[in-house]
Amino acid sequence: MSSGVQGGPAAHANAYQTHPLRDAASALGTLSPQAYVDVVSAAQRNFLERMSQLASEQCDAQPAAHDARLDDRPALRAPQERDAPPLGASDTGSRASGAAKLTELLGVLMSVISASSLDELKQRSDIWNQMSKAAQDNLSRLSDAFQRATDEAKAAADAAEQAAAAAKQAGADAKAADAAVDAAQKRYDDAVKQGLPDDQLQSLKAALEQARQQAGDAHGRADALQADATKKLDAASALATQARACEQQVDDAVNQATQQYGASASLRTPQSPRLSGAAELTAVLGKLQELISSGNVKELESKQKLFTEMQAKREAELQKKSDEYQAQVKKAEEMQKTMGCIGKIVGWVITAVSFAAAAFTGGASLALAAVGLALAVGDEISRATTGVSFMDKLMQPVMDAILKPLMEMISSLITKALVACGVDQQKAELAGAILGAVVTGVALVAAAFVGASAVKAVASKVIDAMAGQLTKLMDSAIGKMLVQLIEKFSEKSGLQALGSRTATAMTRMRRAIGVEAKEDGMLLANRFEKAGTVMNVGNQVSQAAGGIVVGVERAKAMGLLADVKEAMYDIKLLGDLLKQAVDAFAEHNRVLAQLMQQMSDAGEMQTSTGKLILRNARAV
């Protein structure tokens, strides 16, 4: 029988493969500590029961069924004769007593071993359970924090979306209000052009002001809602970043638990559905990115429109200021030309008066008239050739020493009086300068007619200054050239013959009007000389006043030029602001792209970790 058993297919099989505890033993490496304790306890009970059964059979001298052994192998015996008594029959009692003792010893030994093994397993199981519970509590806490952060980020994203929609609607309302303002402005302009009555114009103007007020309120609401949307968008971004940090903490805790408790820990512990919120967080962040991108685009469009409108307005103002500047410059040039013409006319009148006075002085003042004519012609020639008027240089000391201090004193008194009356400082100074020049001229004219001693002193100073300047002029190259020109002009034009003829004609004219006495001629000559002096002073005063007016116009032109430069700077500043807005938009998009790239890398790392765990897992 034994040979038959050995000769069958089971003879070539491994005893471990057919052992009843094979499955339990193979599962020891993958079971939890509690299951491991249960398996070992069952194996010990099975072993003790089997040992008790074998011991009782041997004590009763009864062979076990099928000669069964603990390892299910057949019991082999030496061949015996049929009639021969079994060996060792006399010491059956002793053998039975030895088997019982062996069973008792084995039982005690197994009891001790089992007790120590169970205690150790229980201790390890308790430690394992405590560590597992702590890890589970930590993971649960992190999972709850992650879930809360995800919910808050989602709620903030929804609030930001609603705020963005409200800001968009407010922007549309503001555009509609601007269109209403443009329509009201057009109706008002058309009414002004058509010349409608004042009551209709007032009604249209009131409607225009109301539309402007509504447009201002609409723009204020739009700006407030846009600021609120931006604030909520920033809050949503911060919450999304916080949720991402919580997710990273959860991933780190899971990786640490996997390394500490083995690769099969994730298989033994069911995965909490709260930890699978990466997809939800990705969706929330994607939605948040869409909102941020949309908000950045709208903000860029709004800034671009605002800067474009501001640039258009500044360009219109710049064009207007430029036109005003050109007009002021042209006005100043025309004023300067006009005053120059007036000065020339008065100069020729003075020359004519000098020639008229020659008739009553017997030709004595004709030389002065000729000199005046020569100076006038020479001044025009010098101005045309060199661009410099020597008459202006001659009169400059008079202006600096006499007229300017007098005009400044009178102007200061007038300015102080106007300021004391409540007039603006700048306007008072301008009016004082003009009135000072006029009052100075009037005073000199009045003094010339009255013949006061002060005028004589002034006249003496004027004559001394002019004599000195005239001497310097005649010694200079210009004076020498002027003398040569006058001589040539006299020779070519017959000025000497003209002078003699003029003297003869003047003598006849003097006799015709009844001026026979020398005293009468001198009296008329003095009167003509006074008239010439008065006209000369009036000419200088008018020229000074004209210079002041021209200076005022030039000052206005310079102010307009400053406004033009300021407008050009504003346009450049608006261009720089628009460039900064574009750079900020590009930076926001770059940050969002980097955030999404980090999320993608985190998802890829999580997938790789899952694949590694699955490869290292063993089937139970």
Swiss-Prot record:
Disulfide bonds: none
GO cellular component, one term: extracellular region
Annotated Basic and acidic residues bias: 66-84
Keywords: Coiled coil, Host membrane, Membrane, Secreted, Transmembrane, Transmembrane helix, Virulence
UniProt-listed InterPro entries: BipB-like_C, IpaB/BipB/SctE_N, T3SS_SctE/BipB
Residue segments, region Disordered: 58-95
Keyword match GTP-binding: no
Coiled coil residues, start to end: 309-339
Subcellular location: Secreted; Host membrane
A family per Pfam: SseC
Membrane spanning stretches: 355-375, 401-421, 430-450
Keyword Zinc found: no
Protein family according to the UniProt entry: Belongs to the SctE/SipB/YopB family.
Function: Plays a role in the bacterium-induced formation of multinucleated giant cell (MNGC), which is formed after host cell fusion, as well as in the intercellular spreading of bacteria and in the induction of apoptosis in macrophages. May act in concert with other effector proteins to induce fusion of host cell membranes.
Protein name, per record: Translocator protein BipB
Record organism: Burkholderia pseudomallei (strain 668)
Gene transcribed to yield this protein: bipB
